[in-house]
A protein has these predicted regions:
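Primarily recognizes the serine-hydrolase "nucleophile elbow" in alpha/beta-hydrolase
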Residues: 29-110
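Active-site-adjacent alpha-helix of alpha/beta-hydrolase-fold enzymes
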Residues: 109-185
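Extracytoplasmic/periplasmic, Sec-exported soluble proteins
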Residues: 14-22, 83, 176-184
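Active-site machinery of serine-nucleophile hydrolases
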Residues: 1-9, 150-153, 157
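Alpha/beta-hydrolase active-site loop
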Residues: 2-49
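Alpha/beta-hydrolase-fold serine-hydrolase catalytic core, especially in secreted/extracellular enzymes
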Residues: 156-162, 166-224
């Protein structure tokens, strides 16, 4: 179907339909890992079913959050969408849904697994029939000393929702944001090494490294 951006009520219903169908797809894939390996012999013995990560970009990030414990709420009628999926061990997001009205006021509260989020100062969400600047709102309060699980936040100066057209869409204004994408990619790999591979060097890098110094002020990293 085509998203109806001229009717907020219908658009929210469509978005929840998308996330609901996608979360079911994710659970179905987990249920089918053995069959998938049988269909694709090259994957045999390469899938670690004990280390599973939910990952996504934009609305895909909303779906990843949904299967990691967060609740989406339709602001028009209060309908709540949740998931009883418990098999994901970590959550990785590039450009979360920011201040989308479906997001709860404090979305970090529902997620109980190690979380990584990368966004940029020029990130935005498409709302209604036009574009609306969307500040980074997934970030937990500064006065919160520690959350229920480690939440890593990377903010990249100048990065937009599509990295200048390098990811997701190619029909957006450039220029390509190679440096911004490289920062997000490198930090994502470090996060996965730390929490999926239990690599102590990667964990030390996340906890004690200084991304701002390393990138000459281009990006910052915080942990709660």
């Amino acid at each position: 179907f085509k998203m109806n951006r001229n009717s907020m009520s219908e658009m929210y219903q469509q978005m929840l339909f998308v996330t609901d169908s996608r979360r079911q797809d994710m659970s179905f894939i987990l249920d089918s890992l053995i069959e998938i390996q049988q269909l694709i012999p090259e994957l045999k013995s390469k899938l670690d079913q004990e280390k599973i990560v939910a990952a996504g970009h934009s609305m895909g990030a909303a779906t990843a959050m949904l299967v990691s414990g967060m609740t989406l709420v339709n602001p028009m009628d209060g309908y709540k969408e949740t998931s009883d999926e418990k098999r994901f061990d970590a959550l990785l997001m590039i450009s979360d849904p920011t201040n989308m009205a479906l997001m709860p006021p404090e979305p970090w509260k529902g997620v109980k697994v190690p979380t990584f989020i990368s966004t940029g100062t020029n990130d935005f969400s498409d709302v209604g029939s036009g574009r609306m600047s969307a500040p980074f709102t997934y970030q937990i309060p500064e006065n919160l000393l520690q959350s229920s699980s480690p939440h890593h936040f990377v903010l990249i100066e100048g990065a937009d929702h599509y990295m200048g057209g390098l990811i997701c869409r190619t029909d957006v204004p450039g220029p390509f944001q190679y440096e911004e994408l490289q920062i997000a990619s490198n930090m994502s790999v470090t996060f996965l090494d730390a929490y999926v591979k239990n690599n102590p060097k990667a964990l030390r890098s996340l906890r004690y490294g200084n991304l701002s110094v390393k990138t000459k002020g281009k990006a910052s990293h915080s942990l709660r």
